[in-house]
Amino acid sequence: MTADIHHIGGAPVIIGAGIAGLMTALHLAPQPVVLLSRTSLGTEASSILAQGGLAASLGEDDSPDLHLADTLAAGEGLCDEQMARRVVEAAPQAVENLIRLGTPFDRSLDGRLQLGLEAAHSRRRIVHAAGDATGRELFRALLGVARRTRSITIMEGMTALRLVVAEGSIVGLLTVLHGAVFALPTRRVVLATGGIGGLFCDTTNPLSSFGHGLALAACAGAELADLEFVQFHPTALDIARRPMPLVSEAVRGEGAVLIDEHGHRLLADTPGAELASRDVVARAISDQLAAGHGVYLDARHCLGQKFARRFPAIDAICKHAGIDPAVEPIPVRPAAHYHMGGVAVDAEGRTSVSGLWACGEVACTGLHGANRLASNSLTEAVATAAWVAESVAGTSAGWQWPRLPATVPIRPDPSPIRTIVSNALGIVRNGKSLCDTVATLLPISVCETAAADPALVALLMAIAALRREESRGSHFRSDFPGRDAAALPSRLTLCTAFENAVTLRWQASERSR
């Protein structure tokens, strides 16, 4: 295969230009860094869609210990407690750093930061910007600083196709720009590619978010962690638009309740009610929908005419769909929202492949465990970006001519497998469906088609879900509804996943004889 060599002087390359990628690049300054974005900046970053905000113990009645306790409780035994403590202790300073970078967080009349309450938090500790447009405002501030930072080279429209590895270490990456293939020689690559929501029919993520970074890392030989844990946000706006608009948890934090089509409250007898953990609320709504009922979020009594002022973006989206939240309930359903699993990393974001780091949703730091605490994800991205950048900066630069792969992968498209993934890896799973899905995805994942890389990621997730024969957090198996006494994190490589998949397919063929 031939490709033009694009010389970047051995500078580190960050793949992904959402909040995790931008923060890492800014922390690397004044070191030169190359930032890749598949599209025009801001058009496909999941973090821009974030409404909830950042969680940090900023209130007088709050502390990092309380934030940690809530995080560990939500994670159901699978959080890395040391990493979780490090993140929650760094969170207040991370918010201060964002303020210095120009993020306009909401404040009360006396100038103090407004603190919101969200599900499974014991204190008000969520900071927002522009009410329900935190991700957009944060991204806008960071992008402005990045564009003014001369050490950051932003390459828009460039897609990373494969990482090039020699003797277990990164030596470059293969990219495509306007149909032309380029090789970028570098010994330092940071994955900041976001999540996997685009694998599902119902998602709040950009439809292109299929797990691009997971595919790159897996094909490079990196170890992956906890891939079975997918968080479904309970309250996406139930309209035809994709990605589905989010109805922020903060609406429930202000007192909105979930009702059926008859006005009966759904979670009155559930511990935590509307502010129970997301997996509990999502399963309850899913059960109602499966039984043929409608589910609605009713904010009329708690917010009424104040809804538009408190949640302007949600109000505008609802009204565009013909719904006025001030006077009528909002139709909702769960949607794939966040991936707790990802590329296994250490405390500095290093993966098992030398020269490869991961930051943000694509990374599995151990903070979230089996179920992410609301608004901890932006906090994680901002806090860990500093540690990733420090590690990258402390690693020797240099480059060599990368030996390129024989073929160029096709630009990925997850649309052919969305229904398959949604049916097998949704809120409720079972072994037979997962086995059938593995058998379906295996041949797709090794073909030279646009669905290959998305199928590869889905295959890895299905194998991980099969291997966890229990229900914990966001992973619910109808054939294994109980929770094991021991909480064990899962680890997987592409090689192991393929071995498992081939064995399962052979066993299925033997049974059918």
Curated annotation (Swiss-Prot):
Binds 1 FAD per subunit. Its EC number is 1.4.3.16. It catalyses: L-aspartate + O2 = iminosuccinate + H2O2. The active site is at 278 (proton donor/acceptor). Its cofactor is FAD. GO terms for molecular function: L-aspartate oxidase activity; nucleotide binding. Pathway: Cofactor biosynthesis; NAD(+) biosynthesis; iminoaspartate from L-aspartate (oxidase route): step 1/1. Gene3D superfamilies: FAD/NAD(P)-binding domain (3.50.50.60), Fumarate reductase/succinate dehydrogenase flavoprotein-like, C-terminal domain (1.20.58.100), Succinate dehydrogenase/fumarate reductase flavoprotein, catalytic domain (3.90.700.10). This is L-aspartate oxidase.
